[in-house]
Amino acid sequence: MISIFDIMDLLKHDNYILENFEFQNGEVLENVNVAYSTMGKPKYNDEGKITNLILLSHSFEESFESHWGKDIILDENFIFNRKDYFFVIIVPLGIPDSCSPSLTKLNHNFPKYTFEDRVNFKRQFLKEKFDFSKIHAILANSVGGYESLVWAYMYPDDMELLVVLSVTYRIRGDNYITALSIKEIIESNENFYDEIYDNSLIKMMLPLFKLGYINSIPKNKLFNSDYDEIDMYLTDFEDRSLFRDIYDFYYVNELLINYDIEDKLANVKAKTLVIGDTNHIYYDFDVDILPFKELINDSIVIPVNIERNIDENGDFSEYSDILKNFLN
């Protein structure tokens, strides 16, 4: 089995500067940084466009290590031939180390962005840096899956295949209330709109991070753990919160509040596989996942039950044949 250190050695990390980027609201930023990683070699058609591109998209945690796609790449029975495809991972708009409130130091003055902006950010980068004819496949998880679904209906001819895990087409009522509450708690801090980063904002991140990430604890752990074990999980969230910026967190949370694409998914042309983890507490399979069968024309929806520990993606081995058949 290839280790995570081996795969990180295979990945090449770099940055690219977009001369400018225009948001949907008309605001423009100049000298916009895009952090990205690649693996493999691109293949080109007669027009010089890349034909073997596979895009891996981040989860809410926004790191490749936390993305379930790494298990596909790390698997000794790798479902893709590494020699045949060119893999690209792009840190999204709004997330360090790409253009974000914290990286630009714009904080609350950073332009309000949408999932459509995040799609255009990645698409502009790919067109400028790695001009492609069509993306062979996008593999995405959680918030990265939301973004990829938006991409699929905005630019339906851009991709052939789409695989999304732990996604929904609209934020369910209880999750909407949580996201809205986080927004209101942050905005209630009188220092949020100050030009100087106040210490009270740093202290605020700890309870907010617990509230925002509690849904990342799988059902098998949350429902069957005693309070001491749950306190251990929360301690881990405390450690993570020390490295999170409240403005970055605020803007990503805003995306969730406004997410509802139910009436747009009929425009998706990509052959789509939706994987619903029934052990994920944030999603209800019948409410959030199953409707994709009717919402996306060429789609397959499968339930999986992935028992796992905190910060583990679980064992996908029994589903590898499904993925292989779908992606190849």
Where on the chain are the PLM-derived regions?
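Conserved hydrolase catalytic core segment
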Residues: 133-174
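Alpha/beta-hydrolase
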Residues: 183-275, 283
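Catalytic-loop region of hydrolases
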Residues: 1-53
